[in-house]
Amino acid sequence: MGVLGTRAFQDGLNRVLFPPRLQTPGNKDEGPAWRAARILRRMREGRTAYVVVDAADDGSETVIGYAQWDRPKVPGQDTPQDEPAKEDDTPSSLDKEALARLNEILDKIAVTALGPDGFQSMWCRCSASLTNSYISNLNSDLVILSVDPDHQRRGAGRMLVQWGMEQAAAEGKKVFVIATPEGKPLYEAMGFEAIADPVDLLGFPNQAMLWIPTSYGS
């Protein structure tokens, strides 16, 4: 899954976070290992992972896409999100300053759209080949959505997003996403609407979008 995440991010932000100037023959595998470690840590912290697999001709199962969803905070109930964030060992190939700027920008976008307490009751947050997505107390939060480039346009991304939308709809909550140019058409096709001007994310335009289920407010 760490390799898949790296393949899904081969262009755009991946080149900013893992610039050529920091790449060496000795650290080429650090990026996938770092992504895998972050995924496993989040799983151990109690987050929910939803995985799409593709059965190969030989009967093996090849992961072609995955999404990782955070459930919303329940009032009065302690959750892993209440604990101090744990730092992962960052690889030498990662531009730590660029990662810090990225997180700062994403936080500002989410606070502007969701309000200062928006993160407190997030359902899920997503950063992916298709999108960077956030969902709040109004919403769901898709932590990670990645689809192997060799298997895109086969419906895997739609399945992963649809799953989270169904969870949010069951609770009568909205879904807020920050969509990359690659992900925007998918979200538009699934009923999301732009709610603000595009935002520059380290040189790449991203669009804040919102989906409101028919059950919202009922």
Per-region residue spans from a language model:
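Conserved acetyl-CoA pyrophosphate-binding loop and the N-cap/start of the following alpha-helix
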Residues: 151, 155-160
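C-terminal helix/juxtamembrane-tail motif
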Residues: 205-218
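Active-site rim helix/loop that mediates acceptor-substrate recognition in acyltransferases
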Residues: 13, 18-49, 55-58, 68
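Conserved active-site alpha-helix within GNAT-family acetyltransferase domains
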Residues: 158, 170-172, 181-203
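Structural signal for hydrophobic/aromatic residues that build the beta-strand cores
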Residues: 52, 142-145, 164, 175, ...
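Conserved GNAT acetyl-CoA-binding A-motif
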Residues: 120-124, 138-140, 167-179
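Conserved acyl-donor/pantetheine-binding loop and adjacent beta-alpha core of acyl/acetyltransferases
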Residues: 46, 60-152, 200-202, 217
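A short beta-loop-alpha structural element at the N-terminal edge
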Residues: 1-14
